[in-house]
Amino acid sequence: MSLWKKTLYKSVCLALALLVAVTVFQRSVTPGQFLQDPLPPTPGPAKTGNLVNPNSFWKSSKDVAAPTPTVPRGPQVWDVITTNCSININLTHQPWFQSLEPHFRQFLAYRHCRYFPMLLNHPEKCAGDVYMLVVVKSVITQHDRREVIRQTWGHEWESAGLGRGAVRTLFLLGTASKQEERTHYQQLLAYEDRLYADILQWDFLDSFFNLTLKEIHFLKWLDIYCPNVPFVFKGDDDVFVNPTNLLEFLSDRQPQENLFVGDVLKHARPIRKKDNKYYIPAVMYGKATYPPYAGGGGFLMSGSLARQLHHACDTLELFPIDDVFLGMCLEVLGVKPTGHEGFKTFGISRVRSSRMNKEPCFYRAMLVVHKLLPAELLAMWDLVHSNLTCSVKFQVL
């Protein structure tokens, strides 16, 4: 039976099991066991301190990274246990604030709320010898994407080869954005996590602007529970990843390097058109360009740099575009992200209808390709791992 048929069968079985689970949970569990009262429009406990307001492919030449500075350890457990976030009253009466769109007013009014309690945690993922942590941003409703990733590129390895340790996978989630659906989806997620034990979840709403929260929460979690992991791959739940190529790329890399590799955008300008998803008002960011940043659903970094990023990000005000925010954090450290042709932000070809975007020989050579639907990912994974004969060998290592 082919992989996609097996996955379809498993998904059907899991769906039936979830329906049964919901019935059981609804009879035996109160909603409060999984969620606190609904959060304010946007997130968490206030962060104190002085914050800065920021107004051949694979083996190609690489920068020699400076030695990683010593970073003091933070708390040894997740130390945020309550949600106590109130609106920033000082902003609400400012004329410039009132002129903004509602979602920007909400973001700014609660931007000081940085960290939230954990609902699901798996520190055991970093027990033993772990070489690379694969971390996937997801949302509570996208079970099908998580299931396909577990069956394909997110499958865990006990050894990365060449004497290296294990490869472990985690999914990062907030809570359901619609209050009326929250209890239902939380019960389903609890059941999913009992099956797979691979979900990190925090008590903030999953939304586009809260993706930045997901970044800083993971960096804090990594610093607490996984401080010695050599490398981290972080991606979205709609990308194709070739883990074999990732590991080959890392084969001559050192964990002490300030490594941050992806599809890097340089001299990107803030978008000022209000109908664009990535629109940013000038009052929120007045500079002509963003710092260099890696976009497009996936990047690779050393664990030592991730720890530095955690502390660097804590010196900045939150920014609503997560990729750009990480670029700002890198700028604080004086680290420039490295561009790599094996990371494809907009598909292998920017022309969506191009045959190249459906050519498995290209996917076999890449590290990360964005973006694919679950069925497309399954089909491409099967093709790439079949007895595929390519007329031209693409050298990307």
Swiss-Prot record:
Its EC number is 2.4.1.-. One of its GO terms (molecular function) is acetylglucosaminyltransferase activity. The chain crosses the membrane at residues 7-26. The keyword Transmembrane applies. Glycans are attached at N84, N90, N210, N387. GO terms for cellular component: Golgi membrane. Residues 27-397 are lumenal. It comes from the Eukaryota. Keywords: Glycoprotein, Glycosyltransferase, Golgi apparatus, Membrane, Signal-anchor, Transferase, Transmembrane, Transmembrane helix. It is a single-pass type II membrane protein. It is an enzyme of class 2 (transferase). The keyword Glycosyltransferase applies. N-acetyl glucosamine (GlcNAc) transferase that catalyzes the transfer of GlcNAc via a beta1->3 linkage from UDP-GlcNAc to the non-reducing terminal galactose (Gal) in the linearly growing chain of N- and O-linked keratan sulfate proteoglycans. Cooperates with B4GALT4 galactosyltransferase and CHST6 and CHST1 sulfotransferases to construct and elongate mono- and disulfated disaccharide units [->3Galbeta1->4(6-sulfoGlcNAcbeta)1->] and [->3(6-sulfoGalbeta)1->4(6-sulfoGlcNAcbeta)1->] within keratan sulfate polymer. This is UDP-GlcNAc:betaGal beta-1,3-N-acetylglucosaminyltransferase 7. The lineage of its organism: Eukaryota, Metazoa, Chordata, Craniata, Vertebrata.
